[in-house]
Amino acid sequence: MYSSRRTAHRPAAARAVPSVLLALAACSASTGGPSAGSPVPVSTVAVPFADYHQHLMSPGLVELWSDPVLPTVELPEALDRVLRTRERVAGTSAGGEIYTEDAQVVELSPWVANWIRGRSAVEDLVSRVRPGARFVPNGYGIEGSSAWIATTVFRGDGPSARAVANFLFVLRRTADGTWRIAAESASLKPPSITAPVIAEQLVARLDEAGIRQAVVLSGAYGFASDSSAGPDEHARVRAENDWTAAQVASYPERLVGFCGVNPIRDYAVAELERCASALHLRGLKLHLGNSGVDVRNPAHVEQLRHVFRTANRLRLPITIHLRTPDPTYGREHSLIFLEQILPEAPDVPVQVAHLAGTSPGYSSDEAMAPLAEAVAAGDPRTRSLYFDLAGNVTPTISAETAQLIARRIRQVGTERILFGSDLDPASSPRREWGTFRGMIPLTDTEFRTIADNRLPYLPPGRFRTGSPPR
């Protein structure tokens, strides 16, 4: 599942532009792919047998992960005028009029820092931003000749309006009394989930795509992160796994449920055993980033080894979000996983989510590389290692990134690549598969192999699905 802050990839023609702004720009330039470099109509492509990376959303998780927009505030007229001008100049060459000569735009995240400095460079950026965004202020301050405005960016009107980003503007009053933008920073908002998503809704989305089965990954670990933990943590983790088990049980031939735990909690093994025996969940989902795991900490590694051994003993396949909170996450972290943790589960499929990174986009190739190299070298520790690419392929990835993903797929072999779409209210399994087919330069045979991959833990059955798209 998406992290609380995510970065999007940018077209090759604009590598110097902050990715968060280009995600809003929706530039029309080709970004690569098998032909035109855009998502192909789903009606023309093969249909995956299964979606190996899906989530439901319980009422408890909605409350935990919802990101409500702050109340709107009324700005002084002079500051409001700056925002309205900023809206108006998007997509035009007139943007420079509202910026200072030394203006800069910065995007900061745990993993990247991109800067643009100078009025002309910022003006060029603004000229390529898709118009139509609305900046809704939710805070401001003025001190002498300096001011700041915090805003939420919306696209769409009425019921379809959606918050897509948060912007912070820093303003400076010039000698003639005019307020100009001296700096602005932005962060993409994850898709807003405001209502539960239940099994019936997921099955309908699978039917729309003609996908027969899905693996539902419990988000119970969300209640055990450092930011959400409380005295009732264990009870909430149990309740979430209970809820997931009850949901997937209503579609036993279509849905497979995986238990969710924080692997470094002292109750992790007991909860995993309960999930297998009492709830009949068929696998384990681990999210190292959400769970605060540090694979450079020997105590954390030992606990992960214990959890992997337990899953192997219970014959529970594992899906692991390998990226940790460490901002230096990369090759060293993957090698620790490969050498010290993975060998503890030699008899079950182990699925590395998001090509060893996060989503959206593909930004962790340094972590993916040693795993792909080990597979290509025939390392026996990787005998049951698989990879999903949930959220890695977006309509805005560069041609260079698309080629890199294709190279990694071929390096590990298409038989190890699993389709997954994650839970994104703004997308669907149907759309995600079409985007993957349209953006990544693989052959039809390679796409067919990925679509047909079926891991042994999926239940047998006669499937009643909607007809695959024609």
Walk through the language-model features, giving the residues of each.
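Active-site gating/metal-coordination segments in enzymes
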Residues: 212-213, 220-326, 332
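Catalytic pocket-lining loop regions of alpha/beta-barrel enzymes
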Residues: 282-283, 296-418
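Histidine-centered divalent metal-coordination motifs
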Residues: 50-59, 321, 354
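Bacterial N-terminal signal peptides
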Residues: 15-26
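A solvent-exposed, acidic/Ser-Thr-rich amphipathic alpha-helical stretch
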Residues: 50, 64-67, 71-75, 81, ...
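Mid-to-C-terminal alpha-helical segments outside catalytic/metal-binding sites
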Residues: 26-31, 39-48, 64, 93-94, ...
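Short beta-strand edge/turn micro-motifs at domain boundaries
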Residues: 164-188
